[in-house]
Amino acid sequence: MSSGKIAQVIGPVVDVLFAAGEKLPEINNALVVYKNDERKTKIVLEVALELGDGMVRTIAMESTDGLTRGMEVLDTGRPISVPVGKETLGRVFNVLGDTIDLEAPFTEDAERQPIHKKAPTFDELSTSSEILETGIKVIDLLAPYLKGGKVGLFGGAGVGKTVLIQELIHNIAQEHGGISVFTGVGERTREGNDLYWEMKESGVIEKTAMVFGQMNEPPGARMRVALTGLTIAEYFRDVEGQDVLLFIDNIFRFTQAGSEVSALLGRMPSAVGYQPTLATEMGQLQERITSTKKGSVTSIQAIYVPADDYTDPAPATAFAHLDSTTNLERKLVQLGIYPAVDPLASSSRALAPEIVGEEHYAVAAEVKRVLQRYHELQDIIAILGMDELSDEEKTLVARARRIQFFLSQNFNVAEQFTGQPGSYVPVAETVRGFKEILDGKYDHLPEDAFRGVGSIEDVIAKAEKMGF
């Protein structure tokens, strides 16, 4: 194990000098600095650049407080390695694979795997197309998720990305019994803490491994924590042959941390100040998230859109890798429609007759047509009023409003805020409900009966309570 000495510390960047004759560490190797002689507390550094003359530049995974020039640095000879396997379920980790849930730490002989790996080869990939039922009407009907696909949840600040992710974890664990890996990348510690306790209360935690690199942590940790979560998910896919759900909240913070690291390493910035290696870094992460012949990793990634600008390089680069996009719209939040999924902007490769079936495809297409026409008529209504519309258009507007409200539903994970029980709606029920609304079967029911309910039976029950 070769050793060097700290030459300089600039925030999270640490330069290490290896003496002549010492073997230089490879790029991405983990180096360790012990803060005191007892060797109880250590700081892990990851090699980022070789500067020449025995000097390497590293990025710290923890705060560099207390580091001084001349301290000894040891090369571990391998990348950061994290625990994998069934023992990780129900536990909470940091970027280094250390437990942070105040329960017993993992032993040294626990199975570990390096976080840097190659993506599966072409002949290992699976090509089947199967729908993953989420129980959320707007998603299942208009932008269904593929098993083993990549889904992006797009939206600005405060439109409900994290709540939607929590509901997906809840539904998939309760209805499908699947394993989930939740990776918190650069988000609020409070949200991570709330999620942990909610999952513990609902019993979902037993099927979930959680990895966090939160907002207050150095950029190195925020940049690598997504790889830590992915490594745990890959083990369940490749060794256990499982179908795994990988949640990343928020993939924008991964890019943001990469931008910070790039600037600290002295690279010339690219468009909008992002790192020149943006597309490469995103590709290296996304190409590992895939389905193989052994199992699948379905990833659901929350993507913060800076200032609601979809042309920003960070969300635009993520777009290229996705099978489905779920766009959250602030205007729907203002109308009180939750989840605030934009039915016209959201899309999915899976919405094809050969995958979802002819009836589902036809109903989804008609729902989109009605909503699009309503969207076009809104200007006329705003200027001239409803009276200027033809009878046919008035009927279409009435149905479109019912559809818009019926696309909302109460979530199980939001019950404590709304006071309303959540609902899980199977795909067949969803398709039937919308087909009957389009056929005019419920034109006599009030619009409010369609808001925040589950199946069409719930609409009828709500209308009866209202006296209809």
UniProtKB/Swiss-Prot annotation:
SUPFAM superfamilies named in the record: C-terminal domain of alpha and beta subunits of F1 ATP synthase, N-terminal domain of alpha and beta subunits of F1 ATP synthase, P-loop containing nucleoside triphosphate hydrolases
Keyword check for Repeat: no
GO molecular function list: ATP binding; ATP hydrolysis activity; proton-transporting ATP synthase activity, rotational mechanism
Location in the cell: Cell membrane
Subunit structure: F-type ATPases have 2 components, CF(1) - the catalytic core - and CF(0) - the membrane proton channel. CF(1) has five subunits: alpha(3), beta(3), gamma(1), delta(1), epsilon(1). CF(0) has three main subunits: a(1), b(2) and c(9-12). The alpha and beta chains form an alternating ring which encloses part of the gamma chain. CF(1) is attached to CF(0) by a central stalk formed by the gamma and epsilon chains, while a peripheral stalk is formed by the delta and b chains.
Membrane topology: Peripheral membrane protein
Name recorded for this polypeptide: ATP synthase subunit beta
Record's function text: Produces ATP from ADP in the presence of a proton gradient across the membrane. The catalytic sites are hosted primarily by the beta subunits.
Major place of residence: membrane
Family membership: Belongs to the ATPase alpha/beta chains family.
Organism annotation: Streptococcus pneumoniae (strain CGSP14)
Broad class of enzyme this protein falls into: translocase
Lineage top rank: taxon: Bacteria
The encoding gene: atpD
Keywords: ATP synthesis, ATP-binding, Cell membrane, CF(1), Hydrogen ion transport, Ion transport, Membrane, Nucleotide-binding, Translocase, Transport
GO cellular-component term (any): proton-transporting ATP synthase complex
